[in-house]
Each structure stands twice: as structure tokens, then as C-alpha cells.
């Protein structure tokens, strides 16, 4: 028999599972198949009588294409839902969309080139609703490309009448329970959006602001022995335009103040800040003449420099000595602390800024100027009155509208609020029982709830859920349960458009009509909408909150996690969630935030088009997602390399399992016993990491496992697989292990790279095979012998030593391949002597001695297996095993 003919006697691997993944071609085909086969419904059916596990989807905003942050979020959720389903949990996942609010309203108006002031509310709402639906359809098609396991025909939208009615039932209960009130308070106000904002709608940017020191002349010393009429109180401000609403100067109750004398003029500042004031104001040769405590200043009157009011000096709880002068100008409607002080001291409440930021009649000659642009004229006025002592700029963090990215201000307006104080302790009590991943996040949420101020829930816009309040002839809110119920019934039937379509009387029960009632025209904060999802969304008729898991970005501690908790506790006195998992933001390779202007935006759809969704999903799983994560071509390529190793390993396993029928009764010995026990140990680690949502550990464990498996077990068993007789005992032990490893690997990767897992599963000759890998359950971890694993540690230490010797021998030219080497092992233990070291170390011969060394030994190569043997062992150019097999094939 010739050497070429020997190939016919070998057991060569064979599989149609391709080395090239072709994900971009295959993923749409698998997705189509899964939809056609109703895979998601069948997964639910499989587990319908089992313990439920519900990951409740926080709704993304129905505006624009998905970005890389969406991909990170949805893929993480999908991994968990798939994993839990394969663990046997009944795990329905209902995606939803946040559909109201200013971004949709503005984008619709911009795209349609319509002015907000000329379109009717009904037409605006109709167009906004249509726009939201178009955006949802667009995002659904994009989310599908992520290979998500869900039914996109069964989604929720916050604009659906059923949802809106549930939201209004919550609002009704909160009003009747005294949790909702209307009041005049300074709130975050966006001139660019012309509406109030909640804290969660505010972002901060570093900006340069004017920094000025202003002198206010005392006209009534109020009997003070230390202060004279004509002395000047010095305040420092970064918002000069608020001086038009100045109503008082606040001082620290326990601070020491002094008079700074300069050119016969006295300036009053805190003593601790006096030298800094002198330096900044360039008051050369100024002297600090007299000290006094705060009592000497209380009740003193001064003349406000811009509005000519006579104003008092009062105590301020917020005054500090960190910067400025220790005297703070108070404009009661332009700051929370200012408002408290203004209320406590019955100060003048001046509102000189309109909704759009333009100054009104109260600003006098500055009327008609945008508030920030008034600063230049104010500087001129102060200078003309010798009141501007110093002017500069300061760079600081300043609040901006998260939608328009333009500056906002604190502005006193009548708004609707949710009182947090009344339920704060309940909220904190509920947080005690929840778990967070990462663990430190729980403290973050507790701190936010502890410090949270009352929630401004009213918005001065049109596209949203109305605040269904009526006012009587005197302008007082009419709070009546029957009225609420009547409106809610109408909304459930017709949606909230009816609030704008009907007159007030048409929305009232008959007995309340013809009383001259008017409607509130503000809408609710969209965070109130999305915060209602646990109450308004029916995931399954038998499933109720609290749900097992909420998973969103870390910005949602002040957003959805926060509003959901408040709304749920207000309605049910219970948290809506048992556990929170949060992820960070996606940054570029340098750790910088992505922006179109920087040109560093990574589009997930482009990544999918180039690499496939499985590669993007692998990047997500492999990222330390609880922190901010990086993405770049290099990082994607690194994950592609991990993918390639996993795929090639599975291909090798499948190829060798061709035609094999699994026999779990096969008793494994030697290295095969070690591999069997190691596999169960790996399973345990992987399942534990999945349970802890530590997906990077899942990937690292699997990657390390396949790398080590390939370099050792898959390598040393090639002769057993190819050369031994098809049904030899050692080959059966090897293939039994291969089957178990393949079964584990395909299942373990299924939640993360579902297309690849399904592809591999189709080519896996599995007993009791199902129609899809995603209908399978994870196997339980079988008992394994850790002593076996420990026993083999000695061998692997020896293997590392021998490999180093072999590498040096090849480098020096002593041998070309390891199977040409004779290895002497120094004084091995009896355990080591018991191993088939020639096979395990893949060398030509093994000896034991007093020195470890590698030699080239006199050998001949077997023409069938290509291994080296001593010449005496070779017969007809074949080693003993190959000779025996060939003779058997030839019928001898």
C-alpha cells in the first residue's frame, strides 16, 4: 500500500460548518427563520410553567437611529433574557418606546418646517404621533439587526391610550393622597425650549461667565455702631442680569465682617476674604479698619443699584467663605436658596425674564433684551454709578438643556410638583431590599433619593400627557375623584388628544358643567411617563411588579430608576424592581466622548454590516460594562480574534464528531478523565459568571479554555482521532469528551453569539436534538473530582519546563520538530511516570534520569502517522500500531 493510499485508512475530520463565519450573510437568514418558526413564543411556551424572571425594558426615546449606546443596552438585556430562558426561567421581554416630549415635538416641527406658534395643538399632536410611529418602525428594524430574542409585534408605547389612562390613574392617586401640589418656585427653566426641566433633563458644560464685584450703598445703618451710612456692601455675582431682581443681601450668621477703607470710602466684606477682595479690586493702600459680627449688619438698608429698591440685609443659610465677599445678592425668583430667604423675609419677588429669556417691563430700560445680552449694558450702568469694583471671567460648570444644549436658568414660575418629602422614607426603605450591580451603585441611588428635591412634573408644551386639572372661576384647582375618573375613562377610549379636542365642559361629568371651569394646559414630564411603565405595561397577565431586573445606563440613577421608584412607591408602596444593573457610556479608543464634530462616532449598524452582529455582541459581552467602555476598529478586531478561536475550536470538534454516536457510559481514564473533570469545573465558572451578569468573565473563561484546549488536548489527541481504529477505546473516550465539550460550548456561547451557536448546532450530531439551540436548556454541573485537577497540576508544570527545552532545541537546530526529540526527565514522581508522556508531550521518546535534557535520537518516521520511532520498531515503514491497522484493512 502506497503512502497516498494510507490516507484512506485515516479517520479524517469532516463537517459542513464553515471556517469563515459569513455573519453578514447568515444573520438575516437566521433571523428570518427564527421569526418564521416563532422561536421567541416557543421559548416562552417551553418555560411557561416555570419560575418567572422578568427583565423590564426601559423605553428608549422614539427619535432618530439607534446609536452604539442603544446597542450596548439592548445586547446586554438580550444576553440576560436568553441565558435565563436557557436556565428554564419563564422570561418574557417586552420592548417599549418613550413617545412624548420636546425632542419629538421639535424634530417634527423642524422636519416639517412649521413654526410652533402657528400650528394648532391638535395638528401638532397628530404630526408628533405619526413621527414617533415612523421612528419606532425605523428603530425596530435596526434593533432586529442586533439579533434580539423578542416579538416586535408586541411592544408598548407611552402614547397608547391604555398606557396614558394608567398614567392618569397614578396621577389621580398622587393628587388625592396629597403628593401633588401647585406652587411658585424657582425651577430649571430652558429659554430655548420655553419649558421647565427636571434634574434628569439637565446636563453640565464648562462655560466662561462674567465675574463682578458690585458695591451697594448703605442708606440706613439701622443703629449700627460699626457701620456708617454711605459705606458700601460688596457682593460678588456671576449672573449680573439677576441684579435687576435684587431684593436683599444675605450674610453668614456666624461670620466676622470688616470695613475696608480706601480713599475715604468704606467697603463691607467678610474679614476672611478682605485681602482677596482688595487684591482683585486693586484697592492700593486700602486698610482694614474695624471688625464686627453679623449682628451689626442685620436690618441695615441699602439702595439696590439697578432697580432703585430699598432692600435689607438678612441672614442667609447658604452664604459661605469659599469665594466672593461673604455677602450674597438675593433675587428670590432666581435661585432655590434665594427663594427660601425671600419667603422667610417677605422680600420683593421680581420676575423680569419672560419664558423665552427676553427681559420684560420689570427690567425697565432693559426691556426686550435677551437676559444674557443685557450684561454689557448692566456693566456700563454699574460703572457710571461707581458700583463696579472689579470685572473678570470665571470658568465653571453651568447647567444646560439636555435637548438643545443651551444654557438654562433658575426661574420662579407656577408649576406642578410631586412632594418627595412625604414619601422619602418609604423610598429609602424600599431601596434597602434591592440589589445593584455594581454594588456601589446602591449607595449612589440612596444618596440621590435622600437629597432629591420636589419633582417638577409640569411642562409648558403640547406633545404629552395632560395634567388633568380643572380650575374654578377663582383660579383654584378643583380636586375631585369623580372628575378624574370621568376624564380617565375618556382617555382610555380616545387617547389624550381629547383634552385638546374638547372644551372644558365636555370633559366634565354633567353635574360639574356650566360652572365656568377652565383646563390646565401643561403636560407631564416625560420622566413621569416612563416612570409609570411598571404600572402601565402588561408583560403577562400573571406577572406583576416588582420585576426581577431593570438594566439601563448609569445616567438613569437620576432618570428612569429614580422616577420609576417614586411612581411605584406612590401607587403600590413597593419598589418596581428587585435588582438594578447599570452600564457606563461608550467612548472612543482614547476614552473620549463621541461626537459628530470630533468624527469619532461609531455606528453600530456599520459595525454589523462590516463584521456581523455576533462580533458586536461579543464586544459587549467582553467589555467591563459597569464602567465606561471603549470601542474602536482595533478593539473590534481583538474581539474578532477571540471569535475566530472559538469558531475554529468548534469546527475542529464538529469535524471529528462526524458520524459519532454519543455514549455517556464510556468510562474515561488518564488525560481523558482530567478533561472530563476540567470541563465540569469550567461549566461551574461560566454559569456563575452568567448568574452574576459578569459576561466579560464568561468570555475570558471560555477564551482561555479553548486556547488551552487547542494547545493541549485537541493537539495530543489528533493521533488518537486520525490514526487509531475508528472504534478504539481511547478514541471513544476522546470523542465522548469532544461531544461534551461541544455541547457545552455551543450552549455557553448561545446567549452571546446566537447566530454562531445556531449555525454550529445545526452541524452538531446531538442526541435528542431540538429545532434550535435556543430551545435547549443549560446542563447542570455534574459532580467532579477536584483532586484529579490538582493531581494534574504537577504534569502541567513539567510540560512548561519541557516545552522550554524543546523550543531551545528547535532554535539551536538540534531538532526540527518535537516528535524528533528524545526527552530525559529529571527524577519524576511515580504519578508522572504513570502517564503516557510520549503522547502527552508529543515527543519521539521519553527517558528518566538525573538531568532534564533534550536530544535528537536515531529514529525513523512512520509513513502513516508521521511520528518518529526507533528503527527497530518500524516495519514496512510503519509503526507497530499503523502496521496492525493497515494489515487489518488489507485483510491480513
Curated annotation (Swiss-Prot):
Motif segment ('HIGH' region): 60-70
Catalysed reaction, written as an equation: tRNA(Ile) + L-isoleucine + ATP = L-isoleucyl-tRNA(Ile) + AMP + diphosphate
Pfam families: Anticodon_1, tRNA-synt_1, zf-FPG_IleRS
Binding-site positions, L-isoleucyl-5'-AMP: 552
Entry superkingdom: Bacteria
Cofactor binding note: Binds 1 zinc ion per subunit.
Binding site for ATP: 596
SUPFAM superfamilies according to UniProt: Anticodon-binding domain of a subclass of class I aminoacyl-tRNA synthetases, Nucleotidylyl transferase, ValRS/IleRS/LeuRS editing domain
Protein location: Cytoplasm
Enzyme class: ligase
Motif ('KMSKS' region): 593-597
GO molecular function: aminoacyl-tRNA deacylase activity; ATP binding; isoleucine-tRNA ligase activity; tRNA binding; zinc ion binding
GO biological process: isoleucyl-tRNA aminoacylation
Principal location listed in the UniProt entry: cytoplasm
Keyword Zinc: yes
Keyword check for Nucleotidyltransferase: no
Cofactor(s) essential for the protein: Zn(2+)
Positions with a binding annotation for Zn(2+): 862, 865, 879, 882
Assigned GO CC terms: cytosol
Family annotation (CDD domains): Anticodon_Ia_Ile_BEm, IleRS_core
Domain notes: IleRS has two distinct active sites: one for aminoacylation and one for editing. The misactivated valine is translocated from the active site to the editing site, which sterically excludes the correctly activated isoleucine. The single editing site contains two valyl binding pockets, one specific for each substrate (Val-AMP or Val-tRNA(Ile)).
NCBIfam families per the UniProt record, alphabetical: ileS (TIGR00392)
Protein function: Catalyzes the attachment of isoleucine to tRNA(Ile). As IleRS can inadvertently accommodate and process structurally similar amino acids such as valine, to avoid such errors it has two additional distinct tRNA(Ile)-dependent editing activities. One activity is designated as 'pretransfer' editing and involves the hydrolysis of activated Val-AMP. The other activity is designated 'posttransfer' editing and involves deacylation of mischarged Val-tRNA(Ile).
Subunit note: Monomer.
Family, as annotated: Belongs to the class-I aminoacyl-tRNA synthetase family. IleS type 1 subfamily.
Protein name: Isoleucine--tRNA ligase
Record organism: Mycoplasmopsis agalactiae (strain NCTC 10123 / CIP 59.7 / PG2)
Amino acid at each position: 500500500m502506497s503512502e497516498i493510499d494510507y490516507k484512506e485508512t485515516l479517520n479524517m475530520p469532516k463537517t459542513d460548518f464553515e471556517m469563515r463565519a459569513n455573519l453578514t450573510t447568515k444573520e438575516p437568514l437566521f433571523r428570518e427563520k427564527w421569526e418564521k418558526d416563532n422561536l421567541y413564543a416557543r421559548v416562552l411556551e417551553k418555560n411557561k410553567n416555570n419560575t418567572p424572571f422578568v427583565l423590564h425594558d426601559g423605553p428608549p426615546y422614539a427619535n432618530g437611529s439607534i446609536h452604539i449606546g442603544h446597542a450596548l443596552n439592548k445586547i446586554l438585556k438580550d444576553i440576560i433574557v436568553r441565558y435565563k430562558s436557557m436556565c428554564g426561567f419563564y422570561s418574557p421581554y417586552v420592548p417599549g418606546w418613550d413617545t412624548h416630549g420636546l425632542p419629538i415635538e421639535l424634530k417634527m416641527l423642524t422636519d416639517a418646517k412649521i413654526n410652533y406658534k402657528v400650528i394648532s395643538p391638535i395638528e401638532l399632536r397628530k404630526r408628533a404621533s405619526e413621527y414617533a410611529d415612523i421612528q419606532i418602525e425605523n428603530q425596530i428594524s435596526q434593533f432586529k439587526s442586533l439579533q434580539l430574542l423578542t416579538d416586535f409585534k408586541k411592544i408598548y408605547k407611552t402614547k397608547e391610550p391604555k398606557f396614558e389612562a394608567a398614567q392618569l390613574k397614578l396621577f389621580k392617586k398622587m393628587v388625592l393622597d396629597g403628593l401633588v401640589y401647585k406652587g411658585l418656585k424657582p425651577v430649571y427653566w430652558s429659554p430655548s425650549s420655553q419649558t421647565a426641566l427636571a434634574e434628569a433633563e439637565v446636563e453640565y458644560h464648562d462655560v466662561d461667565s462674567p465675574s463682578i464685584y458690585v458695591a451697594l450703598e448703605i442708606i440706613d445703618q439701622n443703629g449700627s455702631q460699626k457701620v456708617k451710612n454711605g459705606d458700601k456692601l460688596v457682593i460678588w455675582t456671576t449672573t449680573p442680569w439677576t441684579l435687576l431682581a435684587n431684593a436683599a443681601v444675605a450674610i453668614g450668621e456666624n461670620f466676622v465682617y470688616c470695613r475696608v477703607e480706601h480713599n475715604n470710602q468704606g467697603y463691607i466684606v467678610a474679614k476672611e476674604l478682605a485681602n482677596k477682595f482688595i487684591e482683585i479690586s486693586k484697592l492700593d493702600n486700602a486698610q482694614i479698619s474695624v471688625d464686627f459680627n453679623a449682628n451689626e449688619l442685620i436690618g441695615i438698608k441699602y439702595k439696590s443699584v439697578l432697580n432703585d429698591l430699598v432692600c435689607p440685609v438678612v441672614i442667609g443659610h447658604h452664604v459661605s467663605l469659599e469665594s466672593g465677599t461673604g455677602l450674597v445678592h438675593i433675587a428670590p425668583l432666581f435661585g432655590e436658596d434665594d427663594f427660601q430667604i425671600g419667603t422667610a423675609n417677605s422680600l420683593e419677588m421680581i420676575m423680569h425674564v419672560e419664558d423665552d429669556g427676553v427681559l420684560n417691563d420689570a427690567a425697565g430700560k432693559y426691556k426686550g433684551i435677551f437676559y444674557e445680552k443685557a450684561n454689557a449694558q448692566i456693566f456700563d450702568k454699574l460703572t457710571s454709578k461707581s458700583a463696579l469694583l472689579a470685572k473678570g471671567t470665571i470658568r465653571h460648570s453651568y447647567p444646560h438643556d439636555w435637548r438643545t444644549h443651551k444654557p438654562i436658568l433658575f426661574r420662579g414660575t407656577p408649576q406642578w410638583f410631586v412632594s418627595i418629602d412625604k414619601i422619602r422614607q418609604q423610598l429609602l426603605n424600599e431601596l434597602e431590599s434591592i440589589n445593584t450591580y455594581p454594588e456601589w451603585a446602591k449607595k449612589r441611588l440612596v444618596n440621590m433619593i435622600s437629597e432629591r428635591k420636589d419633582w417638577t412634573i409640569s411642562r409648558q408644551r403640547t406633545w404629552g400627557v395632560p395634567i388633568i386639572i380643572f380650575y374654578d372661576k377663582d383660579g383654584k384647582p378643583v380636586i375631585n375623584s369623580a372628575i378624574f375618573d370621568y376624564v380617565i375613562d375618556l382617555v382610555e377610549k380616545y387617547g389624550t388628544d381629547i383634552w385638546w379636542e374638547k372644551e372644558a365642559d365636555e370633559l366634565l361629568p354633567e353635574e360639574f358643567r356650566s360652572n365656568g371651569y377652565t383646563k390646565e394646559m401643561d403636560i407631564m414630564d416625560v420622566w413621569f411617563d416612563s416612570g409609570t411603565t411598571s404600572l402601565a405595561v402588561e408583560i403577562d397577565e400573571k406577572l406583576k411588579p416588582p420585576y426581577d431586573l431593570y438594566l439601563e445606563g448609569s445616567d438613569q440613577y437620576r432618570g428612569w430608576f429614580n422616577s420609576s421608584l417614586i411612581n411605584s412607591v406612590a401607587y403600590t408602596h413597593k419598589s418596581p424592581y428587585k435588582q438594578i444593573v447599570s452600564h457606563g457610556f461608550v467612548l472612543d479608543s482614547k476614552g473620549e466622548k463621541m461626537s459628530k464634530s470630533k468624527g469619532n462616532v461609531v455606528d453600530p449598524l456599520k459595525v454589523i454590516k462590516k463584521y456581523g452582529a455576533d462580533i458586536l455582541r461579543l464586544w459587549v459581552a467582553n467589555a467591563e460594562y459597569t464602567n465606561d467602555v471603549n470601542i474602536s476598529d482595533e478593539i473590534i478586531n481583538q474581539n474578532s480574534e477571540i471569535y475566530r478561536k472559538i469558531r475554529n475550536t468548534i469546527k475542529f470538534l464538529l469535524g471529528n464528531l462526524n458520524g459519532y454516536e454519543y455514549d455517556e457510559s464510556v468510562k474515561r481514564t488518564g488525560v481523558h478523565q482530567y478533561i472530563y473533570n476540567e470541563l465540569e469545573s469550567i461549566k461551574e465558572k461560566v454559569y456563575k459568571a452568567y448568574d452574576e451578569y459578569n459576561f466579560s468573565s464568561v468570555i475570558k473563561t471560555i477564551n482561555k479554555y479553548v486556547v488551552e484546549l487547542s494547545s493541549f488536548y485537541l493537539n495530543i489527541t489528533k493521533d488518537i482521532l486520525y490514526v487509531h481504529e475508528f472504534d478504539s477505546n481511547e478514541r471513544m473516550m476522546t470523542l465522548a469528551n469532544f461531544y461534551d465539550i461541544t455541547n457545552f460550548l455551543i450552549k455557553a456561547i448561545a446567549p452571546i453569539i446566537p447566530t454562531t451557536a445556531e449555525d454550529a448546532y445545526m452541524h452538531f450530531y446531538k442526541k435528542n436534538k431540538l429545532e434550535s439551540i435556543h430551545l435547549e436548556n443549560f446542563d447542570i454541573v455534574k459532580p467532579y473530582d477536584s483532586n484529579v485537577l490538582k493531581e494534574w497540576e504537577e504534569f502541567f508544570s513539567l510540560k512548561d519546563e519541557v516545552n522550554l527545552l524543546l523550543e531551545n532545541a528547535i532554535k539551536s537546530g538540534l531538532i526540527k520538530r518535537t516528535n524528533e526529540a528524545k526527552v530525559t526527565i529529571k527524577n519524576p514522581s511515580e504519578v508522572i511516570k504513570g502517564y503516557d508522556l510520549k503522547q502527552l508531550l508529543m515527543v519521539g521518546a521519553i527517558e528518566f534520569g538525573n538531568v532534564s535534557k533534550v536530544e535528537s535520537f536515531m529514529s525513523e518516521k512512520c509513513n502513516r502517522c508521521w511520528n518518529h520511532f526507533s528503527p527497530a520498531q518500524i516495519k514496512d515503514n510503519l509503526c507497530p500500531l499503523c502496521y496492525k491497522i493497515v494489515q487489518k484493512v488489507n485483510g491480513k
